[in-house]
Regions:
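A short acidic, Gly/Pro-enriched loop at the edge of an enzyme's catalytic core
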Residues: 123-135
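Class I SAM-dependent methyltransferase SAM/SAH-binding core
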Residues: 68, 77-124
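Short, glycine-/aromatic-enriched active-site segment of Class I SAM-dependent methyltransferases
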Residues: 170-193
């Protein structure tokens, strides 16, 4: 299988994107900045909850777990994990604006003692070994150019027996078709994705990091409707009125919404859910 194309991603541009647009994300999409899992005709916000529920169920999140949420956005997953599982959550984001907004909400909810947020670049993050029961990654790994190294760091910070829970944008798990290349390139550029990789790539990187892969599921069919809803938001008259006042990168981002619909429809893109475990002390790794 051919290697996934690599695309240059400027960390400063990623930070600026989330600093500038997080308030609009919350206004138009809510506090959960990720796909939804659609089973019928649910609302997008209900579907977003269902995606978290599915990942948490597959990962068997233990009550009271210490969780690291990498790419935490506005804290949607962090607050949900604290509410439903009593977790102690540390959220990591590249965006000072997101960290400030999420910290303000945590204080307002009286959760500052167990839901906190840090500004860190996950590309340069140096993890404390054996610290967390769960590392939760909801659609942020796409931004990172060195995914094998990133998953090694995730494995390092997990306690023995700890769990890695990941949802990720992917490309189809087959050699890339020539007519998919320009579409993938346009999406990666607009969405600041360093690469769009395959289900097999992610599984291999987790195994190489010393983890046992418990689940590697293609749930594309259930998440694809997300972008039909996003395309409607992009066509909203208020958004169309606002767009000319934004920078070129923001306009390119919004104009990519219909490209996402197309990419899912023609099978160029996919979506994966992964659960992997760090072997407990003295336990042999399972090959998955």
């Amino acid at each position: 299988m051919s290697a996934s194309p690599q695309f240059p991603v400027d960390v400063g541009h990623v930070r600026e994107h989330y600093d500038r647009l997080s308030s609009l994300y919350r206004l138009f999409w809510g506090e959960h900045l990720h796909h939804g899992y659609f089973e019928a005709d649910e609302s997008p916000r209900r579907a977003q909850i269902q995606l978290m529920e599915r990942l948490a169920e597959r990962a068997a999140i233990p009550r009271g777990a210490r969780v690291l949420d990498i790419g935490c956005g506005l804290g949607g997953s962090a607050f949900w994990l604290a509410e439903h599982f009593g977790c102690d959550v540390t959220g990591m984001t590249i965006s000072p604006v997101q960290a400030r907004m999420a910290s303000k909400k945590s204080a307002a909810l009286g959760l500052s003692d167990r839901v906190r947020f840090e500004v860190k670049d996950a590309n340069r993050w140096q993890p404390e070994p054996d610290r967390f029961d769960v590392v939760w990654i909801m659609e942020s790994s796409e931004h990172f150019p060195d995914k094998p190294g990133f998953f090694e760091r995730c494995a390092r910070t997990l306690k023995p027996g700890g769990t890695l829970a990941v949802c990720a944008w992917l490309r189809r798990d087959a050699p890339m078709r020539e007519d998919d290349r320009p579409l993938i390139r346009a999406i990666a550029k607009a969405m600041m994705s360093a690469s769009l990789d395959t289900l097999s790539d992610y599984r291999r990187w987790m195994l190489d990091a010393g983890l046992s892969v418990i689940a590697a599921e293609d749930i594309t069919r259930n998440v694809a409707p997300t972008w039909t809803h996003c395309a409607r938001i992009g066509a909203n008259p208020v958004v169309r009125l606002f767009l000319p006042l934004t920078g070129a990168a923001t306009r390119e981002f919004v104009r990519a919404f219909p490209l996402m619909v197309q990419a899912y429809a023609q099978g160029a893109m996919a979506f994966g859910l992964f659960v992997a475990k760090k072997p407990a002390t003295g336990e042999a790794r399972r090959s998955g």
